[in-house]
């Protein structure tokens, strides 16, 4: 069909090369080629903007320091003034496994440096740059702080982090929630067969460690994909020409769908991935107790998954005869366009 030529005849990348440096959790370079001429800039710019603005992350939103009423203060025995301390607090890198606001506390007596690693965290919170210096204490000086940590996206100025019922002494902090710290891309010419006029896109992504560069790029691509879907006003003609279905299976073919297509939260999706749960059929055979024993998997994730499964007429703890089939990967591909 002519309509399909609009996208089927365009070249798609057949190579995706990922190169990591000394710290693969923070820096990676991804090369995609070949691309149609002009698509390198189109995709590179879109991915860069989404990476920097739209990924969820955690950050400190406010701090309370004993004996301090506002940020234009000084603390006896502390070399930095409160303004400098707040600037340092802004750069604390945090990984949070919960969407709910959390509190962290710090208490230390001098002399010596006060670092992010001195902060007492709860189980759902992890400090990713513990060597970050917050302030310096003289001999005999003491400091106590309480931090509020929340999740969000992009940059939120301090004034928007001040609650209406803020107590005296609460200092709101500018929050940079994005786990992505730097993105750059370049477009070069590459060849496809005898055609020397194709694009090669090279993207370098740096994160604070809360998410790997590869995952960050994948999340950004998914965001763009979801945003563009609303503009597609037709069904894929290929579905109309699909081959007849294979013989009837002893279970619901929808169980061959992969769990990463369920649009779960990042935390829930990562927990399933870490537990090697690939297909919906794998998931629904798990009991609630088994799921709650999964590392970093809490009640909120459980309720989210139960709600998604209920919408499909499924639930946890189901017994599925004939699961998993021996040729599960082949079956999943054959039923992909139908379910």
Swiss-Prot record:
Share what the entry says about its subunit structure, partners included: Homodimer. The RNAP catalytic core consists of 2 alpha, 1 beta, 1 beta' and 1 omega subunit. When a sigma factor is associated with the core the holoenzyme is formed, which can initiate transcription.
Recorded catalytic activity of this chain's protein? RNA(n) + a ribonucleoside 5'-triphosphate = RNA(n+1) + diphosphate
EC number(s)? Answer: 2.7.7.6
Q: Which gene encodes it?
A: rpoA
What are the top taxonomic ranks of the organism?
Bacteria, Pseudomonadati, Pseudomonadota, Alphaproteobacteria, Hyphomicrobiales
- Membrane-spanning parts: none
Q: Where is this region: Alpha N-terminal domain (alpha-NTD)?
A: 1-235
Could you give a single Gene Ontology term from the biological process aspect?
DNA-templated transcription
Q: What's the family?
A: Belongs to the RNA polymerase alpha chain family.
Q: Which GO terms describe its cellular component?
A: cytoplasm; DNA-directed RNA polymerase complex
What is the name attached to this protein's record?
Answer: DNA-directed RNA polymerase subunit alpha
Which segments carry the region annotation Alpha C-terminal domain (alpha-CTD)?
251-339
Q: Which Gene Ontology molecular function entries are recorded, alphabetically?
A: DNA binding; DNA-directed RNA polymerase activity; protein dimerization activity
């Amino acid at each position: 069909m002519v309509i399909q030529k609009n996208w089927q005849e365009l070249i798609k990348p057949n190579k995706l090369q990922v190169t990591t440096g000394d710290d693969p959790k923070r820096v990676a370079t991804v090369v995609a080629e070949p691309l149609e001429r002009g698509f390198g800039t189109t995709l590179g710019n879109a991915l860069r903007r989404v990476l920097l603005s739209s990924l969820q992350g955690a950050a400190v939103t406010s701090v309370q320091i004993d004996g301090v009423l506002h940020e234009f203060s000084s603390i006896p025995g502390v070399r930095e003034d409160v303004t400098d301390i707040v600037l340092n607090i802004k750069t604390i890198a945090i990984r949070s496994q919960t969407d709910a606001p959390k509190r962290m506390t710090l208490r230390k007596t001098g002399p010596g440096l006060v670092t992010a690693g001195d902060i007492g965290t709860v189980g759902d919170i992890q400090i990713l740059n513990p060597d970050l210096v917050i302030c310096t204490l003289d001999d005999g000086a003491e400091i106590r702080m309480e931090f509020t940590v929340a999740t969000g996206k992009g940059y939120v100025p301090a004034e928007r982090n001040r609650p209406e019922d803020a107590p005296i002494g609460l200092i709101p902090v500018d929050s940079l929630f994005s786990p992505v710290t730097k993105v750059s891309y370049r477009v070069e010419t590459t060849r496809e067969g005898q055609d020397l006029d194709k694009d090669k896109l090279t993207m370098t992504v740096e994160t604070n460690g809360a998410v790997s560069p590869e995952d960050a790029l994948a999340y950004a691509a998914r965001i763009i994909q979801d945003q563009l879907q609303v503009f597609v006003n037709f069904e894929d003609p290929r579905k109309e020409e699909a081959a007849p279905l294979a013989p009837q299976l002893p279970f619901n073919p929808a169980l061959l769908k992969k769990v990463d297509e369920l649009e779960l939260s990042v935390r829930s999706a990562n927990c399933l991935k870490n537990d090697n749960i690939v297909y919906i059929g794998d998931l629904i055979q798990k009991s609630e107790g088994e799921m709650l024993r999964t590392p970093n998997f809490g009640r909120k994730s459980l309720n989210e998954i139960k709600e998604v499964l209920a919408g499909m007429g499924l639930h946890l703890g189901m017994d599925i005869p004939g699961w998993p089939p021996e040729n599960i990967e082949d079956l999943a591909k054959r039923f992909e366009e139908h379910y």
